[in-house]
Amino acid sequence: MTRTTILIIDDEEPIRALLRFALEAAGYEVTEAANGRQGIDLYRQRPTDLIIADMLMPELNGLDLLLELTREFLHAKVIAISGAGGEQNVLDVAKLLGARQTFEKPFSMPQLMRAVRYELAH
């Protein structure tokens, strides 16, 4: 049986490490990308069951990432996260562009893990 795969896309290494730790502890296989461009390239090579993506990153921000994903991969599941000032506006736009759920940094890990389980089940 293959493990469920999750792609983390965030330019902040500590956030990626935190998410990786929690997700791997829950039994998921995790891949990481440090920016949106790297993330979309990894997803094209090997689509994952879920993406957790920051919305404000260098090279290809999360909103542009969502646009590309929804154009190219209709069924990509994305949870959007953001910690920049005015993040609610960014997260509202992310929802409009196809993010299934959104979280402001700092987020509650138990809430995020519930969202991960929910999205993977639906």
Regions found by a protein language model. Name each.
Residues 27-34, 42:
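Short hydrophobic/Thr-rich beta-strand motif most characteristic of the beta2 strand and flanking loop
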Residues 54:
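Active-site residues of response regulator receiver
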Residues 35-38, 61-65:
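Acidic catalytic/metal-coordinating carboxylates
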